[in-house]
């Protein structure tokens, strides 16, 4: 039983001479389960690829980062640097890890047993940051409106066109078990 929906987005900006493409697919694996596949490519077209960032926010009360073995991801206290730009000051760094192997992140909603599990294959020259961002006053759940939003940033210190960011997201909980074990 498989159904899918595919969406492709293409972004070109003249301010920084970059081209970005995102492909997002929704895959239904059963009448009650499914997952999302996100592939994001980024290329600086008129200069040096210093770095590219992939950012994901998930509503909820927190996140936990794990290696595929199930062990917690070893995190250091290295924060995002001030050269990242003005918008990055809205993030609080909870930890970071350089060049991790394949890993997953478990985001928990915190008001019931709802989770989002994010699987990310390894990539060279990457630093993964566990972050909190500002609260989102528009959440449908009032108890979450004043809490920081759990987030992740993956910084790749090279081109991200031939080596794109890939993430697979699987919602689970409230009786639905996580089906995905790894992504390579």
What spans do the regions from the language model cover?
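CBM-like, beta-strand-rich accessory domains located in the C-terminal region of large
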Residues: 1-184
């Amino acid at each position: 039983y498989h159904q899918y929906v595919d969406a492709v987005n293409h972004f070109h900006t003249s301010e920084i001479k970059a081209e970005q493409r995102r492909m997002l697919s929704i895959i239904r694996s059963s009448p009650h389960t499914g997952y999302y596949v996100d592939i994001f490519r980024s290329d600086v077209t008129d200069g040096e690829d210093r770095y590219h960032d992939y950012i994901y926010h998930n509503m909820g009360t927190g996140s936990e980062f794990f290696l595929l073995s199930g062990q917690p991801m070893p995190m250091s206290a290295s924060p995002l640097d001030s050269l990242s730009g003005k918008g990055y000051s809205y993030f609080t760094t909870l930890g970071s890890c350089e060049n991790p192997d394949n890993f997953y992140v478990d985001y928990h909603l915190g008001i019931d047993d709802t989770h989002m599990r994010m699987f990310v294959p390894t990539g060279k020259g990457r630093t993964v940051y566990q972050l909190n961002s500002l609260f989102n006053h528009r959440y449908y759940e009032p108890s979450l409106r004043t809490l920081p939003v759990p987030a992740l940033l993956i910084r790749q210190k090279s081109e991200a066109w031939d080596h794109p960011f890939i993430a697979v997201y699987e919602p689970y909980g409230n009786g639905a078990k996580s089906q995905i074990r790894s992504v390579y």
